């Protein structure tokens, strides 16, 4: 299956598989959002907010589906 991934606020610099801010990722059927983090090489603690198809995802064990649109945001920082 394929999911569209958008990485915000510089999170793409943490990914070993990123080809920019928006890209498609092939995953095995039944993959979870945690599996996506592993595939991308992004530490889970670097992702504060995950949105799938416009809805905030609270359960990182939730399964993704083919065609899902995933947006990942790091914690907000600054002053």
Task: Show where each model-derived region lies.
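Ubiquitin-like/PB1-type beta-grasp interaction modules and other compact soluble beta-rich domains
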Residues: 1-78
């Amino acid at each position: 299956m394929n999911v569209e991934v958008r990485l915000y606020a510089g999170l793409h610099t943490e990914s070993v598989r990123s080809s920019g801010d928006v890209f498609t990722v092939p995953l095995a059927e039944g993959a979870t959002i945690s599996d996506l983090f592993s595939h991308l090489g992004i530490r889970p603690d670097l992702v504060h907010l995950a949105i799938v198809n416009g809805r905030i995802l609270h359960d990182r064990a939730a399964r993704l589906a083919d065609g899902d649109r995933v947006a990942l945001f790091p914690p907000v920082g600054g002053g």
